Amino acid sequence: RWHDLGKLHAVFQDSMYRCRPPADPAQPLAKSDCAGSMRHSRSFFRHELASMLGWLAQHDGEADADLIAYLILAHHGKVRMSLRAMPNEQADPDFRRFARGIHEGDSLPAMEFDGEHSVATTLRLALMEIGIGDQGPSWSERALGLLERFGPFRLAWLETLVRLADWRASAAEQLEPRQGGNP
């Protein structure tokens, strides 16, 4: 479930509750009742990036943390090897770094899920920088290291396994709708 931790982000939750008022505002939603495609208040918002940053904030330095971070980031096939702002993406003037709708200093609340515990986390984007910074090696350096370690085909295979598992879990949840539903 770490791959959907970013669904706890305020931008994502605002989007989820847009079509229905919260019965319990403390209960996060993972799926929306809105018809059509999701539009977030921040253009280009990707919950996968928030999930990956939350994972690394709590697990960086552990065995295979970069691989898990990569798989979290890539689980919808939109973001993989680079962290960057999109063309025409704009942040508030107060934010130093921003990418894919995530602003430096955004936060994720604490969450208990599947026997895991995620602490409240402030998201940092120093990984966007080149070289080694205050979060260690840049994301580009980490991703290229994974590419070198696993090769493009094995890395793509691992990504495919995670994406298929996510699709199957989503399909199973839709067969048995829940009230709310933790990310």
Q: Each predicted region: which residue ranges?
A:
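Divalent metal-dependent catalytic cores for phosphoryl transfer on phosphate-bearing substrates
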Residues: R1-G180
